[in-house]
């Protein structure tokens, strides 16, 4: 993943990613909105120009390598503290490259490998998050982190049958620091 602040640096960015096709995302986008697959350099430039023309608040744009073998599939891991409490595979239902459930994708429970679990916890820690949704895909090079969400949705509970709210509450209870109260009466 690389960041772009303007459309003039596209050549350098594409070189860092190994060329096209690339995924271009508005950093502030959610639910698969503001995400485009640019299959050529010309298309990437056009998308970036359009994003920056409508991007008055200066939000960054992210560019990511398009991993063909993912075939519209990614994995969401729900991390609480130092463990993954639920995980699901998300698959697009049509030819869309986005597997986001809000774009019509379907989810199924999935078991992660030890390597994947460790990577997800490490990704959440790198972002200084104790509760996070880590999105990644399996590739020929191993698991690749796509993004780390600071406020992941709870739809994963329905899909996996796993309770994620309780581990969050338990984590907070274990880690909440108690501060001594100062008695204001008679002070």
Label each region the model flagged.
Residues 3, 79-80, 138:
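Generic beta-strand structural signal
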Residues 1-33:
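A conserved helix-loop-beta module that forms one wall/lid of the active-site cleft
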Residues 96-145, 166-185:
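A long amphipathic alpha-helix within ATP-dependent nucleotide-binding catalytic cores
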Residues 22, 62, 86, 132, ...:
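Protein kinase-like catalytic core scaffold
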Residues 77-79, 142-156:
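A short beta-strand motif that forms the metal-chelation/ATP-contact edge
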Residues 94-102, 154-163:
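A short, polar/charged loop-to-alpha-helix boundary motif
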Residues 31-123, 127:
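Phosphate-binding site of ATP-dependent enzymes
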Residues 29, 82, 139-142:
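Short strand-connecting beta-turns/loops that link adjacent beta-strands
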